[in-house]
Every structure is written in C-alpha cells, then in structure tokens.
C-alpha cells in the first residue's frame, strides 16, 4: 500500500536505532515503528537454556527444543548422537504420508532451525499469501522457497538465517 511505501522510503536502520550499543540496549524515537525479534527469539531462548544447563548446572548431555528450534550437546543416555526428524514440507501440501528427514546432531554443529511458509498462509484464488514479510517491500514474501533448514553452532544464528532465507529467492541464497 502507499502507507507502507511511504514508511519504507522514510525509515532507515539508523533512524530506528539510536544510542550506545556497548550498553546492550536499543532505543527507537518514532512511536509508529515497532520492533519484533520473532526471527531469532526461539533460537536465542534455546541457546540460553542450553548454556544454563551446560555452564550453570554442569549438564553436558541435553537437547532443548523451543518452538521447533533445537540446540543439543553430548549424547543420548545410550551414548548415541541425538537424532532430529524434520517434516518434509510437501507432506502438508499434498495431504500425503508424513515424510521425515533425519538429522544426526554431532560435533560438527549443535543447533538446527527450520522455517517454512507451508503452514501459515492464506489462499486467495491461485495466489498464496504467506506469513513472512519481506522487509525490502513491506509485503508478504514472494520467495520460491518452501522451507529452509539451517545447521550451525548457535540456534539464534540458525533461526535468523532460516527466517531470512524464507524471504529470499533461491537465486539470492545460492548464486
């Protein structure tokens, strides 16, 4: 809409965030601007819980899941690696049998995040309007990606990348 276009033209990152970032705070001057941290909140929470288990309680074997974002360390009680199953996005679309991909959590990474546009959408005729908003346009994403899975050391980082990938086109991610 024209209101979204006006806001997009008049607001930059520097206009939104003010202050000294060394004090670990952000400040916004314009009341119309809203900040949301949905893109990393669940992953960050999983990281904080995992760090608490590890560094505060001395627990070295755990798996933490917060809203689908996972952080794991060590092994299961049977000394086997943690195994995470990821639903194939086409399962939701075609009403077929659940297809699962299995990911072994090992020493190469400790976190996994999955983001997708195959569950939260509105169908208007032949057009699908997804829940991911492209900050470049202020409109629902027009991505050709159905789901993104990211494996890394920190769930917050995996969560951020998976969310970002869902508004990008495949050609932008893998040139």
Predicted regions and their residues:
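Mature catalytic core of soluble alpha/beta enzymes
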Residues: 1-175
